[in-house]
Amino acid sequence: MNLSKGIKITRALNAVAAGTTSQNGSILDMSGFDGVMFVAALGTLTATQVTSLKAQQGALVGGGDMADLAGSAVGPLADADSNKCLVLDVYRPQKRYVRPVVVRGTANAVIDGVIAIQYSARVKLTIHDAATIAASELHVSPEEGSA
């Protein structure tokens, strides 16, 4: 089995300039998937920043009922952690819709983006989010040569 046929990749949050406000990512529909892994890429962190990644879930399409998942906060990052990633894996959320939230406070933190990887698809051959993923390829036992 190869990974790309059993997952769905979505860019859940675009880059956000330095700031101290929390940023909500896109709401993902988890129907058909057992889990989602969020990978938050951070840029420059200013001394005394308090930056972390958490997940929220809800039953409403528009996210009006989103609530934090208990214990889901990863971080906070150390001041020396500029240009590192935070990874949060949510397996079998109890509600249909899930989103990442990058929590920033005290001093500036740059967000390079958040990628969501939904996995354990109940129906294989999933299609990545065309609104955020431009291209995807699978190569099985490729020969060496020009790319």
Residue spans for each PLM region:
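Surface-exposed, low-hydrophobicity beta-strand/loop segments enriched in small/polar/acidic residues
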Residues: 1-147
